[in-house]
């Protein structure tokens, strides 16, 4: 089994991912979605957590070998980023969604030198908007952001466009396509459910029609 499928299997088993194509969830944007993901749950399961963190380390070594500092997004990327930095013996920082409104007004907590080569850690990629804002903040502070790593991606076309437009490389350990096919193989969903999940990936607005 590939790492992507192994992680997908863990996410399903520990219920970090729920699939309900016949009774969809409603996202904050109002979109009806057949999938809900809470990767913070992974922190409660040592075997899953170790699989993910080791996967991150290998992915970063392969994709971003010149990395000098790991940064986690607040809050979901912080624990994973801290563990990765420890495993790689690298400095760690984290990036707030907006600057503090008191004290020094920091948006990045930790010490990042001008030109320091950074990899940003996120837990989930939907459209990529929030992590790309974090990347922009890090660049404003003088970091040389090499790219973003994440546990899981919904593989939405909007995310592909956003990362391409920003010129930011994205590496994910697992993804929507691997997960939904594995879910059908392991009996979490029916063939009809798989069909609906495939439609959602193609058209988030109209996947329930037809």
UniProtKB/Swiss-Prot annotation:
GO terms for biological process: 'de novo' UMP biosynthetic process; pyrimidine nucleobase biosynthetic process; UMP biosynthetic process. One of its GO terms (molecular function) is magnesium ion binding. Its cofactor is Mg(2+). InterPro entries: OPRT, Or_phspho_trans_dom, PRibTrfase_dom, PRTase-like. The keyword Zinc does not apply. Homodimer. Belongs to the purine/pyrimidine phosphoribosyltransferase family. PyrE subfamily. This is Orotate phosphoribosyltransferase. It comes from Streptococcus pneumoniae (strain ATCC BAA-255 / R6). The gene is pyrE.
